[in-house]
Amino acid sequence: MKNPNRTAREDRRAENGDSTDTIVVCAGKHGSSLQYGKWLIEDLECDGMGFDKRKLGYVSMYRNVVYIGAVRNGDIHMLNLLWQNYNNFGLEGRNLFICGVGLGDPDSQSYVDLLRRRNGCEGQSNIHFFMLPGTIQKNKLIMLDKALFKNFIEVGAHGLYAKEDADLIIERAKNDYDGMSRDALGPLIKKIVELNA
């Protein structure tokens, strides 16, 4: 059965000559994920939306879907809902760009490989994984995040990541860290443009 909202949206896009084929989904209302999403929307002149499980089906209207979320304990925030509905949304033929925003080194192969594997981004040619450097300011964390983060630093990091990666994440978390950079989006933008050519 066709979704009338989806059909109407496609008709409006055709009438207005709107040929954007990329949407950015941000799983965050503030912070690094949201800022990266805003920059990406500006650079690609594409559509964007905040993460809302009731409206996530809209991604099926786009050829390229960019999902940006914070890395928490090795998992990209709310990505599991996208995977649970992968077939329902008809994402098999779409290019998916999964972006994790975290405190680890995006150039560390062990860190990136672990997150790629842990978040289900392996084994399919249409899924592309990118790590973006994030930021942390302990004084801006809410109480629950402070407790979770404290536990992760004391116990979880060394059980999850390689020693070098865990040490770096802990150091950055304890001293506040701001690695966010618009330039970090370069490889992602290049890949999207390349696949659209």
Provide a role label for each language-model segment:
Residues 3-4, 14-17, 65, 74-197:
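FMN-binding flavodoxin-like domain, especially the glycine-rich phosphate-binding loop
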Residues 31, 55-57, 105, 138:
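Flexible, glycine-rich phosphate/dinucleotide-binding loops
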